[in-house]
Amino acid sequence: FIHSGMKKGDTLDKLTLLCKEANVEMVYTDKIFHVLSQKENCYVIGEFHKFTSKLSTQRNHIVLVNPSNAGNMGTIMRSALGFGMNQMAIIRPAVDAFDPKVVRASMGAIFSTDFVYFDSFEEYQKVYGERELYPFMLDAKCSLHDVRPKGRFSLIFGNEATGLPAEFSKIGQSVIIPHSNRIDSLNLPIAASIAMYEATKKTILEI
């Protein structure tokens, strides 16, 4: 759907070409924007079917436990794709990955991300537990700088407000990202991005 306020130029030309190549219909209308868009500067809306994914046992995972902020989830998807970690496990209760705020914040990365919801971490662990597990916790003793994964691994992050429950300290090797005492903690997308970079920096050039 294209808004009448969309200016002609390279962006519209590129979008038109992509739609033609994919046999996707382009509809010029303003009505749908009044219903669906919460922003005044939105000029394109894409409609797609929700899809399901499967996680690979041979790839590294990022695990989000009870994420509640849609924008954060989308931002993490974007970073994860950039660092070659497009396998995401999401532990309920959690935000809907198809929330428009997630899709927007991911900048399209959601369409290249395999994500699966689980009702508990135990459910995830039963299927994918045969790997190195690294829960990120503020009271952990092991610094991220000292983490050297030797095989397939999962980076585990908690809720934006509460972090991971205490019982995660008994799972795998809990890790902390060192920072100055002038802040209480890093926000979730930044912490996850730093962790993914450190864990994949030796292989990132191969992606």
Residue ranges and their predicted role:
Residues K31-F33, P93-V95, F118, E160-T162, ...:
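Short, acidic/turn-prone active-site loops that include or flank metal/cofactor-
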Residues I2-K7, L12-T16, E47, F51-A140:
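RNA substrate-binding interface of SAM-dependent RNA methyltransferases
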Residues L36-K39, Y124-Q125, L144, D184-I190:
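Short, charged, surface-exposed secondary-structure boundary motifs
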Residues N23-E25, D114, E132, Q173:
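Conserved beta-strand segments of alpha/beta enzyme cores
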Residues P135-D184:
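Active-site/ligand-binding-proximal alpha/beta "capping" segment
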Residues K31-V35, Y43-K54:
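Short, charged beta->alpha transition segments
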Residues K14-L36, V116-D119:
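A glycine-rich helix N-cap at a beta->alpha junction
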Residues V44-G46, S79-F83, V95-F111, A166-I207:
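Structured adenosyl-cofactor binding patch, chiefly the S-adenosyl-L-methionine
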